[in-house]
From Swiss-Prot:
Keywords: Carbohydrate metabolism, Disulfide bond, Glycoprotein, Glycosidase, Hydrolase, Polysaccharide degradation, Secreted, Signal, Xylan degradation. It catalyses: Endohydrolysis of (1->4)-beta-D-xylosidic linkages in xylans. Residues 1-18 form the signal peptide. GO terms for cellular component: extracellular region. Glycans are attached at residue 28. This is Endo-1,4-beta-xylanase 2. Belongs to the glycosyl hydrolase 10 (cellulase F) family. Residues 26-325 form the GH10 domain. Induction: Expressed throughout the entire infection process during in infection of rye tissue. One of its GO terms (biological process) is xylan catabolic process. Endo-1,4-beta-xylanase involved in the hydrolysis of xylan, a major structural heterogeneous polysaccharide found in plant biomass representing the second most abundant polysaccharide in the biosphere, after cellulose. One of its GO terms (molecular function) is endo-1,4-beta-xylanase activity. The active site is at 157 (proton donor), 262 (nucleophile).
Length: 325
């Protein structure tokens, strides 16, 4: 199913893009996704990939509990184009086919990132070659899934903590213009998809990184670059929930959309999960939350127990608290 039909169904069910905070008891909703849609959001999603979906019980659980999936690794540069011009899509195709079968929205993740970048890309020395590589890579990957992806994370983690640009091969050769090149290539290849810039540590209203994100997104959008949304990864520690909620409001004011894209909170504290959830609900254009994994067992931070469900798919106390908002 194309994402546009899923989007239409979500809008029909909710009646609005988003709504102010209202009380919806758990008795009215049976899953995180249905709860969030009852608040006018598009989805509560999760990260997954072929390797996790093939584990016993995981695929069925995700299809039941969540409304969106993000490929954790299978759409990254090293997975899709490990050698120049040699593309591999087996794992990404598996995820997309699964999502379409279960009517789940998809967030494509990610075209350009400083990590999981093939060595051959890092070794590029001239501008023209790099521009061609960026455009070819994005047009090929986005073009393959044209019309099937709700949103793409076009660039990922491009800022340092002090708000300066991360010194990657992209920035070193092309300056900030590489961002324009990437977004324009993505828009050309998949014109109906929402295009995002995604980053971590955007959780403090006073952080230099957050201020840089807002500054540059505002500048780029004013210049006509097709930057539609900001993704806040939201890998949090206990006690960060309230600040994160305030930061989401600031990010939402800078773009058409904002989304919490990789949520996990060390120890899964109830108060922080409530604060983050309310923060998204209260921001009209916060379209959804993606948990960075369906259960602790499959989390990149498994030992920190940061997710809403334990290894046996049992909901934690934070789930009940969220559903009672």
């Amino acid at each position: 199913m194309l994402y546009t039909s899923i989007f239409a169904a979500a809008m029909a069910a909710s009646g609005a893009m988003a709504a102010p905070t209202t009380s919806h008891g758990a008795s009215n909703c049976t899953t995180l996704d249905s709860f969030f849609k009852s608040h006018g959001k598009l989805y509560w999603g999760t990260a997954a990939d072929k390797n996790t979906l093939m584990k016993p019980g995981v695929a069925d659980f995700i299809a039941k509990e969540f409304g969106q999936v993000t490929p954790e690794n299978s759409m990254k540069f090293d997975a899709t184009e490990p050698s120049r011009g040699q593309f591999h899509f087996d794992a990404a195709d598996y995820l997309v086919d699964y999502a379409e079968k279960h009517d789940l929205l998809i967030r494509g993740h990610t075209f350009l990132w400083w990590s999981q970048m093939p060595a051959w890309v890092k070794a590029i020395k001239d501008k023209d070659t790099l521009i061609d590589v960026i455009q070819t890579h994005i047009s090929t990957v986005a073009g393959r899934y044209k019309g099937k992806i709700y949103a793409w994370d076009v660039v990922n983690e491009i800022f340092e903590q002090d708000g300066s640009f991360r010194k990657t091969v992209y920035y070193n050769l092309l300056g900030e213009d590489y961002v324009r090149i990437a977004f324009e290539a993505a828009h050309k290849a998949d014109p109906k998809a929402k295009l995002y810039i995604n980053d971590f540590n955007l959780d403090d209203p006073n952080a230099a990184k957050l201020k840089a994100m807002i500054k540059y997104v505002t500048k780029w959008r004013a210049a006509g670059w097709p930057v539609h949304g900001i993704g806040s990864q939201s890998h949090l520690f206990a006690g960060m929930g309230e600040k994160s909620a305030a930061a989401i409001k600031m990010l939402g004011a800078a773009a058409d959309e904002v989304a919490i894209t990789e949520l996990d909170i060390t120890g899964a504290p109830q108060a922080d999960y409530e604060a983050v959830t309310k923060g998204c609900i209260d921001v009209k254009n916060c379209v959804g939350i993606t948990s960075w994994g369906a259960r602790d067992t499959d989390s990149w931070l498994a030992s920190k127990s940061p997710l809403l469900f334990d290894g046996n798919f049992k909901p934690k106390a934070a789930v009940k608290a969220i559903m009672a908002i």
